[in-house]
Amino acid sequence: MNKLIYRFNNQGSQSLFNSKDILGGKGANLAQMAKLGLPVPPGFTISTKVCEYFYRSNKKIPKKIIQETKKEISVIEKISKKKFGDLLNPLLVSVRSGSRVSMPGMMDTILNLGLNDKTVIALKNETSNGRFAKDSYRRLIQMYGNVVLGIESYFFEELIENYKLTKGVIQDNELEEDDWDGLINNFKELVKEKT
């Protein structure tokens, strides 16, 4: 396999401008913005070739990709001065799927990867906003449950709606930090039940 992971950050990009076939649309656009000097957070794109290999190889991720991904996360940690899994200053990342052509609403995303029962406390302390931190963690569980584990979003949404009914509120933003704690526990139970 040739080069499979392409880095981008505010120092530029390792990829070619018109490389949607290799990077997908989002990856190519991020690379182009980085090359133009626009402020983009540090990140990397895993080549579309890896997806092709994944499906040809009985849904196995090559060890080389796992090693390179860990290396790229280390680069992001160095640039951001955050560390994946750190209890004081955790690195949070988003994982976004992409294709050669735009497919709005069809591609999956997982936000807040890096949050867990411990790192959510660091996010709360960093932002001074427990409700935001817990809601972010709840979203991670929901997205991961749906995208990776195949649990229908409906089940998560139903838990939220039922919880709001018991609290007598209409909007998600009316829920307090303790409410999100309760929903996080409910979401974890749902994941256990469905997997």
Model-derived regions, located:
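Nucleotide/phosphate-binding sheet-loop regions of phosphoryl- and nucleotidyl-transfer enzymes
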Residues: 1-195
